[in-house]
């Protein structure tokens, strides 16, 4: 798998994958329409691509997923806005591979932060499996953080 900044020509494909991926959240406790903001918006994804926040996951020349990432000003903390894999490729280890690539994408990152809905048992288990520690929670979200080893930076 390759993780690279999204190409404008792939935005429609990335949005379609995002829509399919987040629409599957119904099967893990989400309500209909309980998806991330703008998950199905071409304009929003174009903006994320233009600002350098949208990445595409490519396997055998096919876009299979994406990530929205935000690096803080000093380059030490990476915020994962979202990651997604096309449901046609679920249960193949692509999500695990994508997150491991995200963790090493920006040199110098010391920690990664993200949040996920409390009701989404799939993503909460996924991030815990990857070594993310729950820092706090509110009525809707669990907030996770992972400190990266110096040898991985």
Cite the ranges covered by each PLM segment:
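Conserved beta-strand in the GNAT
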Residues: 56, 62-71, 77-79, 84
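Conserved GNAT-fold acetyl-CoA-binding loop/helix
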Residues: 19-44
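Conserved active-site alpha-helix within GNAT-family acetyltransferase domains
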Residues: 96-97, 118-137
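A short helix-loop-beta-strand connector motif used in the catalytic cores of GNAT acetyltransferases and
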Residues: 42-56
